């Protein structure tokens, strides 16, 4: 079994992640629940865009070990210091960014107040020396003693040759994630499982690594264990704040997938080919976004992007409006691709008031003008085609109504194609229009997700009746599906709806998914 499991994972080859060949050449004529991966609705017909992984850890374990071994190789201490200074200079973020979020941080909140304790979820990040690095609510200074106690618990258990994973008491969960040289702690009074909380802590960890690289992070603490990492992260807290909001509201982070802008395949193909033609020697990824939806992604041959890296790019773009002011140029580490170094991203909007944002990722630090030329070539080519108008029209209506599916009792659903790493879902109906109701529905999906992916007792189906809605979840080797029905729906009608929905997705897959991703 272990041998088979190892064959199913991705491997590092010359610094490039090579995905497992899971795509099947034969697609099913009609969707059925037992579809194998590669033939389900939404499966890519040519090649995958994203890395496939069974867990958050199996793709980075080797990379992180390598980063630890090579943190100091070939670089003097003076070079490290120069690199850190350059990093601080490049990532000196204007204070206006922190005002871009509608849910601004309550940094001045009294940590001894009832309001602070009443938050359903807290996140803390500290160093292994117990130095505070980040807290979602309140100030790090006010919580330094609390974080010291957390580190003492971790150290005490480690001294006994063990690892502390979680504490459950009085309806509260405290989950620990040690990613040397950092310790991340989540405290929750929600119904989230330990695994779901670990997933969120993983995202926070990768967000920090994306700002510094794991190599720099290890070097800092190897030379000074009690270093105050906030000195380097000052001004970037808004990214972590916004990521935590996304974790509560974006189904893609739950499903480990990305959603596409619904667009006729003919128009998407023109956009993709226009982006493919605007290439450059050092260009690795060309990504076109429409708000929080992917329009297309063109990659260098044999280079693959992980969904976590793409979510971090989404978060970077969505956390600030400053990129609308012109052409941005920023360093970014894609931790699932390479934890040791920076890429450099050219970020700009196609038009000042547009939701269409183009991200060109280069391996070269001094490549700004080349990337700017690539954008101009793309715009010159695209603007002459009718597909550009079709794209702008699609952005005006970035989702679709569940009514189009033709299942009266169905209120909402999430469908993920495993082989493509893409998912689709309709807009929220009126009953879930408020932010609170949307977060409640997502929390219900999280509970279903936890049941399907239980570490020791995973389920293939799960049906649940509630006063306000009925829910059905299903997982096969090809897809994951989560459905929300009216409370008047029966179990029989819910299961009958699955095949009907899959047939509808198959019929619409050209519009809802990227079936033929392009490469340079």
Describe these PLM feature segments:
Residues 1-520:
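Intrinsically disordered, Ser/Thr-rich regulatory regions of eukaryotic membrane-trafficking proteins
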């Amino acid at each position: 079994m272990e041998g088979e499991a190892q064959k199913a994972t991705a491997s590092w080859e010359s610094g490039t992640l090579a995905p497992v060949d899971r795509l099947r050449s034969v697609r099913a004529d009609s969707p059925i629940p037992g579809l194998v991966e590669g033939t389900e609705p939404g499966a890519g017909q040519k090649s995958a865009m994203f890395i496939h992984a069974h867990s958050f850890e199996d793709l980075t374990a080797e990379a992180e070990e390598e980063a630890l071994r090579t943190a100091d190789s070939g670089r003097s201490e003076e070079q490290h210091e120069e690199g850190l200074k350059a990093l601080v200079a490049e990532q000196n973020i204007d204070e206006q960014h922190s005002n871009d979020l509608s849910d601004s941080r309550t940094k001045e909140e009294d940590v001894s107040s009832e309001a602070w304790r009443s938050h359903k979820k807290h996140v803390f990040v500290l160093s292994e020396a117990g130095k505070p690095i980040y807290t979602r609510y309140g100030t790090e200074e006010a919580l330094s003693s609390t974080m010291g106690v957390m580190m003492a618990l971790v150290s005490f258990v480690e001294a006994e040759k063990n690892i502390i994973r979680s504490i459950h008491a009085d309806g509260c969960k405290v989950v620990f994630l040690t990613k040397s040289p950092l310790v991340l702690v989540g405290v929750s009074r929600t119904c989230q499982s330990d695994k779901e909380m670990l997933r969120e802590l993983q995202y926070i960890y990768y967000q920090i690594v994306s700002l510094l690289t794991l190599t720099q992070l290890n070097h800092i603490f190897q030379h000074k264990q009690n270093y105050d990492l906030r000195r380097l992260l000052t001004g970037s807290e808004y990214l972590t704040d916004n990521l935590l909001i996304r974790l509560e509201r974006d189904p893609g982070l739950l499903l480990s997938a990305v959603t596409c802008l619904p667009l006729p395949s003919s128009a998407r193909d023109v956009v993709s080919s226009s982006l493919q033609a605007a290439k450059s020697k050092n260009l690795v990824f060309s990504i076109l976004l429409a708000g929080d939806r992917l329009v297309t992604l063109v990659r260098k041959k044999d280079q693959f992007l992980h969904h976590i890296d793409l979510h971090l790019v989404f978060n970077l773009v969505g956390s600030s409006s400053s990129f609308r002011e012109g052409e941005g140029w920023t360093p970014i580490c894609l931790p699932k691709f390479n934890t040791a170094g920076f890429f450099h991203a050219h970020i700009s909007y196609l038009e000042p008031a547009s939701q269409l944002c183009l991200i060109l990722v280069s391996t070269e630090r001094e490549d700004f003008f080349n990337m700017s030329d690539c954008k101009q070539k793309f715009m010159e080519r695209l603007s002459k085609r009718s597909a550009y108008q079709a794209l702008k029209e699609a952005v005006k209506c970035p989702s679709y109504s569940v009514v189009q599916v033709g299942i009266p009792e169905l209120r909402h659903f999430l469908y993920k194609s495993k082989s493509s790493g893409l998912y689709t879902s309709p807009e929220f109906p009126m009953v879930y229009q408020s932010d609170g109701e949307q977060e409640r529905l997502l929390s219900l999906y999280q509970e279903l997700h936890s049941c399907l992916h239980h570490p020791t007792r995973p389920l293939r189906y799960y049906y649940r009746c509630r006063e306000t809605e009925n829910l059905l979840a299903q997982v096969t080797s090809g897809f994951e599906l989560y459905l929300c029905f009216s409370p008047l729906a029966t179990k029989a009608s819910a299961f009958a709806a699955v095949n009907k929905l899959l047939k509808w997705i198959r019929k619409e897959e050209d519009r809802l998914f990227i079936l033929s991703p392009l490469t340079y």
